[in-house]
Amino acid sequence: MMSERIIRFLNGVGQDLEVATSSRGSSRHRAVVSMIGFFCEGRLSLQVIATLLVALLHIPRCFAQNLPATADKPWYSTQQNQFARRIEKYPEPTYTFEPGKTYTLAELVDLAERQNPDTRVAWQNAKAHAEALGVAKASLFPTIAAVALASTWRYGTLIDGGWQRQTVGLFQPTLNLDYLIFDFGGRSGAIAAAKADLFEANFAFNDMHRKVIYQVTAAYYRLLNAVGQEQAAKATLATARTVERDAEARLDHGLATTPDVLEAQAATAQADYDLQSAIGAKQIANGDLATSMGLRPGTNLLVESISDITIPEALSGTADDAVDRGLEQRPDLLEEVAKVRAADAAIEEERANYFPKLSFSGLGGLQRAYGQQDLFPGKYAGSETWNVQLNLQWTLFDGARREHAIAEAKARRTGAEAGINALRDRIADDVWAAYSNAETSLRQKQAAAALLASADRSYTAALRAYDLGVRNLLDVVAAERALAQARSADVSARTQVLAQFSNLAFRTGDLLRSAQPKGGP
């Protein structure tokens, strides 16, 4: 009865799978249907059918994780909620931050170096390479292991023409020692490669600090520019409102026309529009600075005013000096040099495989055993055990594996050398362009200062002439717009000098000079 129920159940499963097969077109489902039909028609034993049923119960697990059904629809699975819940296991770290405090650039850089997750990732990577160096050095020492063997077995043995049962038990604790005595530089090559990898990781760590410092510095100056633009827009709005009130007063006294007032009102509305744009740009710049420090974008940061910061007046040194500094101290270039050293060490490590290896192994311990046969009483026995051997291994043929391994290592070394040359060219070009941009920003700052002074005098003269009735309001509005543009250009020019000097320090690697040395693990 039970087998009949199972068969009926399997028939139902087969019908369901046939429906699924017709809708999904899976060859694997069709194979399962055929197998079920074969078993059900043959009326196999209950044990076989039950085994098949257990196997069928695991089929949903096989199809639980699948690919997207089509290319035009996103993939979705209930299992992705498990990944989403795992995010909660990694809470955001808490940082030291004082709301309401006006931060200098140096203070923000210090906070970013301690709080930016990218620096922690680079640090952990350097620590991992330091541990890898320790693993490589450990190969110079012997390996000692404690081993305890306990076993028992029973078998038949032939005694006096008959088979007798024999039982044996064994307990054997030992100390095993293995030591590679000499390998013609194989281990030293691995250690040299690990040291070069550690240098590479440390230089990458320093380069990450260089990038973080520049990200914070660039975002800081963008925020300074946004704050300055907001202040300039407020000043322009105040000027426009003054002109609007003057036009309305002159209209009341019959000295102005309605179009003059409308023109002044339009200028005020335009100034207010520009102010709102400046406020939005400041919010975005504030979010960029907070993000570069590892904080939430909504964190409100108070920074110094552009008027409180000393603007450089000239560049120190020539462009060639800047290029030379970049080629000497850029950590990413030093990282490429470390790759060449690692490739050299890998070549030496592979060459050692052409020579024999001499190793020593030995063990010593005690042995306690018990034995019994059906014809004789059981007995215990014990004694010390030891084994010592020298092993000389020399690979004579391996299908040219060593030749290919050395060729691969040499190719990697050649590629690393080419990487140095390519990066050297990019550094020289980047430094040269950054130096030229810095020089241009200095000249633009002087021109913007002269433009602001001229626009301010022009606006003052136009307003005075308008009050005297010798100029119309359109001339005043035009002078007002020119003054607003000059204010914006002056702020942009001053912050551009700071930004371009920072970019030059980033390209040459000078940003790391004033920072505390970051010597990785």
Predicted regions and their residues:
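Amphipathic alpha-helical coiled-coil scaffold segments and their short linker/junction regions
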Residues: 109-113, 256, 260-264, 295-363, ...
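Terminal intrinsically disordered/low-complexity segments used for targeting and assembly
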Residues: 3-12, 46-111, 279-325, 505-521
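N-terminal secretory signal peptides that target proteins for export/translocation
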Residues: 1-42
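Periplasmic alpha-helical coiled-coil/stalk elements that build and connect Gram-negative outer-membrane
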Residues: 203-325, 434-437, 441-444, 482-484, ...
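A short glycine-centered flexible hinge/capping loop motif at secondary-structure junctions
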Residues: 251-255, 466-470, 507, 511
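Transmembrane beta-barrel architecture of outer-membrane proteins
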Residues: 128, 170-172, 218, 263-266, ...
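A glycine-/polar-enriched beta->alpha junction
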Residues: 110-120, 127-143, 174-192, 203-210, ...
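Small/polar, glycine/serine/threonine/aspartate-rich low-complexity segments that form flexible
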Residues: 85, 89-101, 147-179, 304-316, ...
